[in-house]
């Protein structure tokens, strides 16, 4: 917002967060149910919910962010109000800002907002327990009459505070995080087996997730996962080329530098640091950490995080047997136990 509207904006946000009216609850319920229905018709997105459930089981990280239709349909105003009273308290709220403002003035405005909104004092309960030990690898499949199979293979990753996070980002870039990555080149560019193929990596407070996504026709599911398995094994064996690592480092550093041109990204960076209780590193320190990553670190991470016996799998498509046959290429034990 314009910097001269900061006080007004904080007043509105404070009222929304600490004193919502919960008006038009039934209408909003219908909107969310429509959003869930729309999501169900997008298998390339839905499969990511399935792989989270396969990876994290019944833990909160395994649940869809948008919620489930049966819960949204039945939740009452009383339940929502009770949850809000216990969780939306100042001790649980992180406020981050970036732009033309002074820290002291911002703090003063926040205190005023809290008073005007009559926000309760104290700190609420934790939103979720820590993931002490990940569950065994899981398998999820949803049968749909789709033209393509949408497949994710993933495993628990590393926390946002882990020193190896820079190596993990580079591993993601080399494996499938860009148009020059191995999976994109081997599966799409050289063989034309898929339009969408990529790797992904998320880092949370106490764990993370690493994995790959492939959307392809039935005949290509097995060969695509076989290629993915081969590329993971090749990186784990230490076969990262010097120019490959240099390109990944340049790409990662460039994206970080470009992101710093956005005030919104700077704000998000501050907020994530507070939420996850991690050190806020200077840009110079981040660049140095990226430059310091050696090929051996990538090999070790690939070997530890993406070992076949640790991989979960999720798929959406017409035939579960075809999906299970393909999964044998990445985690034979998981497929045979299904």
Can you say where each PLM-predicted feature lies in the sequence?
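Charge-rich, well-structured scaffold segments of protease-associated domains
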Residues: 1-124, 130, 141, 146-151, ...
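Active-site cores that bind ATP or allylic diphosphates and position pyrophosphate for catalysis
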Residues: 134, 187
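Flexible, small-/acidic-enriched active-site or ligand-binding loops
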Residues: 137-138
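Helix-start/capping segments and mature chain N-termini
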Residues: 170-173
